[in-house]
Amino acid sequence: MALPKTIMAFIAFISFLVSTTFAVDVFSTTNVVTYWGQGHDQKRLSHYCQQAEHDIIVIGFVNVFPDQGKGGWPGTNFGNQCFMGTYITPEGEETELLSSCHKIIEDIPICKAAGKTIMLSLGGQAVDGSKTYSVKTRQSAVYFADFLWRAFGPVSPEWDGPRPFGDNVIDGFDFDIEANGGANYEYMVERLRSNFATDSSRQYYLSAAPQCVLPDGNLGNVISSSAFDFIFVQFYNTPSCSAFNWAQNPSKSGFTFDSWVQFIRKGASRNAKLFIGLVGDHTRVSPHGEYTKDDSNYLALPDADKLIKAYMNKYRANFGGVMIWDALTSDENKLVTGTYSSNIKRLLLNNDPSRPTTTSKTMSSTKTSMSTTTSKYTVTTSTISSTSKISSSTWSMPTMTTSTRTTSSTATRSSTIVTPSTSPNPTTSTSTTSGHQNTTATTTEIETQTSKTFITTTSIWSSGTGIGTCTGIPTITTTPRYPNATFTSDTTGSPTMSDTTITLSVTSSMHQISDTTTTIPTFSTTPIQTSDISLSMPSGTTTSKHQSSGITIPGPPHMSTTIVPASPTKPGHSTTTAIVTTTFTSVCPTGITTVTTTYTTIYCPEATPMPTAGNPPPPPGMEWTTIVTTCTKCASTSAIMTVTYPVTVPSEPMTPTQVPGTLPPPGAPGTGSGIPPPKTPSNEPGSPGTLTGIFPPKPTMSVPPEMGGNGGDRTPVYTGGAGVVSPSFSVVVIVLGSIVYHIMQ
């Protein structure tokens, strides 16, 4: 079918618009790089992309190279994130290149919408030495580079070969070479740079992940002779030069950060950003083995703070931040103030000398001239009875059209994309992680930095609601589909304080709601430049106000309640109809956005408390959620803040009963879950073809068996860009729902 391909192409297009606006700030000294793809029972990529602390996420690994791969193609391993299906060459030979990575295909657009930079890592722990990966000749290097560019780079009509991540485009490649290094990798870098130059629409990056010993036998030469953007040094595994060793005695340690700075400054990577590589936890850094608390890998937060402070200030031109292996272990390392990676991000921001100091004092309201965009909907519903029969409620689904290409977009969360799919789990094994969210709806003191990379959130609503536009994101034009739903857009003046009003009508269980007109919602999109910000939360908690350059920030919602008993039409249990107007604060690319909305909700008083100013009910089908996000336009530098806003409650798709699989030890075959993978969707390559030159031939899709067949486990590589065994949305587009609706009509 063409429908899934149309949807994915649309998501990829919107992700491109957003990612060009929120690309990683390569000049920042506060970036956090996180490896993902090899964690034991790890969560989906989208889970980590919705956490503000991750700036660059490196997916691992392409762990088999063409010179060693079946059919002369590379092979991949992403743990539990792909099914067992692989591509087949035109000659009929099965390869090790995974073809059924549907979760990753769905999640990359979410990451791009959140401003994340997504890179793909090559190498990892070389389990079988030269049998695993190496580049034997210059011709092999060029072939491999072109294969990667065609398979994971921008979509090209000239390429009809494999696209493991669909139409998604990754932002660059990471070299985590831990065996057989040295010759020929410089030719890969040269060829990739040449390919990057053919696409001026976006920025691409190259990184390397050497171990801390200098010179590194596998990557030292290529780092010196070829230009890399990022160097992720693994300051663990090797005790003599580890970060842990530095923390014990900085003056006598063999910590090599200084030596690495001098090394890269003498070569082609002189402008590269250097990262301190750390492990995310001192337990379970390897899935099948635990390290003790006094091991020589894990660095406690107080020591990490000292290390960051010492080297960030010493080498500002080359210091880039911290690399963490890996997303899962960091997420499971629950500290008092959040996960390990979120604390590392906080330490980086705190130690950044460019971060302005914050002060608190009462904010005076000053009239400020600003233009805001107000979008209104008028929705008329018909009679509703207690028998749950709804006679033709007319909710319009507006036709959505995007304006011509601009440098902006509205990023909103869609339950069909953000929620991890509960379709049959792949038969591979790797990863579980619980996300870090700040669930306290209070005002947080702002911490700022110069980075431009973080999550942007706006509200989303069910069908029939309007979205106001934000400067810096694509303009969305809505057209009513039915005559009884109207959409207007007008411009108002300065923002004003708004109240939350709930009108209650208590009736018996058999009641009529006739000709009810609800206006939903008014969005006031107001860009605000501030040094300190007070956020209003829907929970009604008191917020402190800080100096804000004369900008008025809405206070907590207020509420007036009117109870009007209606004449019962039939005895029964009473229900309550509440008309709620509430205001909450969100963040858009241009600053703080105040969102005011009115909606109707019906509930049973016996089971649900009466709404109050401190406890406004969420819109129907939605719930309040609180996240920690970063505003890059709220002050002279970026600001971390806590915002609360409504999100759609996801509906879980029906799936067959699943039998958990057994995780095998590394390198051993495993047993499947008993649930076979689905057939490969139509947006992946089809029939074989023939290509000439240095490009690989087009593959034939390997289709997994139908239900009832047996799958198999794919053992994660487990190490790599941060290998620890050998010493070596948030936010998607709201218009997606409308596009799907109209396509299906």
Swiss-Prot record:
GO terms for biological process: chitin catabolic process; polysaccharide catabolic process. Keywords: Carbohydrate metabolism, Cell membrane, Cell wall, Chitin degradation, Chitin-binding, Glycoprotein, Glycosidase, GPI-anchor, Hydrolase, Lipoprotein, Membrane, Polysaccharide degradation, Secreted, Signal. Disulfide bonds: none annotated. Belongs to the glycosyl hydrolase 18 family. Chitinase class III subfamily. GO terms for cellular component: extracellular region; plasma membrane; side of membrane. Glycans are attached at residues 438, 484. Residues 1-23 form the signal peptide. This is Probable endochitinase ARB_07371. GPI-anchored chitinase involved in the degradation of chitin, a component of the cell walls of fungi and exoskeletal elements of some animals (including worms and arthropods). Required to reshape the cell wall at the sites where cell wall remodeling and/or cell wall maturation actively take place such as sites of conidia formation. Its EC number is 3.2.1.14. Residues 721-745 form a propeptide. A lipid is attached at residue 720 (GPI-anchor amidated glycine). It is an enzyme of class 3 (hydrolase). It is found in: Cell membrane; Secreted, Cell wall. The active site is at residue 178. Residues 357-372 have a biased composition (Low complexity). Residues 30-351 form the GH18 domain. SUPFAM superfamilies: (Trans)glycosidases (SSF51445). One of its GO terms (molecular function) is chitin binding. PROSITE patterns: GH18_1, GH18_2. It comes from Arthroderma benhamiae (strain ATCC MYA-4681 / CBS 112371) (Trichophyton mentagrophytes).
